[in-house]
Regions:
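Bacterial N-terminal signal peptides that target proteins for export
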Residues: 2-12
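Bacterial N-terminal signal peptides
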Residues: 12-20
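Sec/Tat signal peptide C-region and signal peptidase I cleavage site
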Residues: 22-26
Length: 241
């Protein structure tokens, strides 16, 4: 009888070990969301003469501005790995401190609503540097086989190296980073890129619809936007002075 009870006790313990993680996961609730809406309190939209759109959302402690180039869809296809870029500014207005995690995710609404996390800048730099090294090796091997192509291939390689070096430098200096914000240092800002190599993300559509999710500790700030914002929308860029 005692042996029978011990066997059932072991079974019960095993079931608890299986069920407890599941129950713990089930209790985790999704974060509440606040969404940008045209005309809503704390929400604004601006077309700048610099050729960029700005969506701003505010509450009592934070101002968050999303900036997107009006030609970003075209520019993304000319960028390394065709990454999509946005610029975010977060300004803290409180008197204490605020931990900004710089955790952004993009929903590609018209592409099966695929969600992509932001590209890690260090991983992106490493990937590009590896591709540069590979291109150097391949080019040198091609020139060795066909010396008459040396001038043309060397020129292309140097251009590729220059563009790659500039992009790596950009990633290391201009990317959005986590920050502790306070009255003495109230602002975090920088570029963020999202991959578009997912098999569900095809050629850009007209218009393209996106949903940027900015994750904070207590809630998610959502910026739905389209490129262009309205059909046929065109910004006349102010020429540089």
């Amino acid at each position: 009888m005692l042996r029978h009870r011990m066997r059932w006790a072991r079974v019960a313990l095993a079931l608890c070990a299986v069920l407890l993680p599941t129950l713990g996961h089930a209790k985790k609730k999704p974060l509440p969301t606040v969404r940008w809406m045209a005309g809503a309190p704390g929400c604004s939209f601006e077309r700048g003469d610099d050729g960029r759109y700005r969506w701003t959302m505010s509450d009592k402690d934070l101002d968050i501005t999303l900036l997107v180039d009006s030609q970003e869809l075209t520019k993304s296809r000319r960028r390394f790995y065709h990454v999509l870029g946005v610029y975010l500014t977060v300004t803290y207005k409180g008197q204490g401190k605020f931990e900004f995690p710089a955790d952004l995710r993009m929903d590609f609404v018209r592409h099966h609503d695929v969600q992509e996390a932001y590209e890690d800048p260090t991983e992106l730099q490493t990937r590009l540097q590896n591709d540069v090294d590979t291109k150097i090796f391949v080019t040198e091997r091609q020139i060795k086989k066909n010396p008459e192509t040396a001038e043309g291939k060397t020129s292309l390689l140097r251009r590729y190296q220059k563009e790659a070096a500039e992009f790596i430098e950009f990633l290391s200096t201009q990317y959005l980073e986590p920050a502790t914000l306070n009255p003495g240092s109230p602002e975090a800002h920088g570029w963020v890129f999202f991959g578009t190599s997912n098999k569900w993300i095809g050629p850009w559509k007209e218009p393209e619809d996106f949903l940027l999710n900015v994750f904070m500790k207590d809630k998610v700030w959502q910026f739905p936007f389209s490129l262009p914002p309205t059909p046929g929308d065109l910004i006349l860029r102010k020429p540089p002075e």
